[in-house]
A protein has these predicted regions:
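Short boundary/linker motifs that mark transitions into or out of structured domains
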Residues: 2-65, 69-70
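Sequence-level detector for tyrosine residue identity
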Residues: 15, 80-86, 152, 160
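DNA-binding patch around the recognition helix
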Residues: 26-50, 115-165
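Short glycine/proline-rich turn/loop motifs
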Residues: 52-56, 109-116
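Generic structural signal for short, flexible, solvent-exposed coil/loop and linker residues
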Residues: 54, 72-73, 78, 133, ...
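Short, charged/polar micro-motifs that form catalytic or ligand-binding hotspots
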Residues: 58-63, 79, 116-124
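Short amphipathic alpha-helical recognition elements used for nucleic-acid or partner binding
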Residues: 61-109
């Protein structure tokens, strides 16, 4: 007999409404060369790889992300260089923002899902979005790696050479 998921379907809230800053910058030391920055334009859903050359910013590449993809990418970028727990990703995915209350609710839901034997079903929508996000972050030389029974972490993609200016 198939078990039913505890997940309630919600559309992620746009970061445009939740975030006062329209463009967020991430230096990601260890993932990007010195002087390189990722700029996430939350209203447009674009992630740009920037470098400053001759005191002028230059864009090396850019990728477009959906709202759902931004909802899982933001907590990963915020957590770097540390891992991002499953409950934080689930909270951000479901509500568009990983507040302490949302994280506590997600932690409880995941514990209940684990006890009911439907943990995989509960996390499947997040994993599907992470899979699409992973394909896009690879163009920046960034891998989204799974840590068994813990969460996800951003890592340098092996054999990736960052574009020259």
């Amino acid at each position: 007999m198939q078990k039913v998921s505890l997940r309630k379907v919600k559309t992620p809230v746009s970061y445009l409404q939740e975030n006062s800053e329209e463009v967020l910058h991430f230096s990601l030391q260890g993932l990007l060369p010195t002087g390189h920055t990722l700029a996430l334009n939350t209203p447009l859903g674009t992630l740009s790889h920037l470098v400053c050359k001759d005191d002028r910013p230059q864009m090396l590449m850019e990728q477009q992300f959906t709202t759902s993809e931004i909802c899982v990418l933001m907590p990963l970028l915020d957590a770097y260089p540390y891992y991002c727990p499953y409950e934080v990703l689930l909270a951000s995915f479901n509500s568009g923002r990983a507040s302490e209350a949302a994280i506590a609710r997600s932690r409880k839901r995941l514990q209940e899902a684990q006890e009911a034997g439907i943990w995989d079903q509960e996390m499947r929508p997040v994993r599907n979005v992470l899979s699409r996000t992973r394909l896009k972050t690879r163009s920046f030389g960034i891998e989204i790696s799974s840590i068994l029974e813990t969460g996800y972490i951003l890592m340098h993609l092996p054999r990736y050479k960052h574009p020259e200016v």
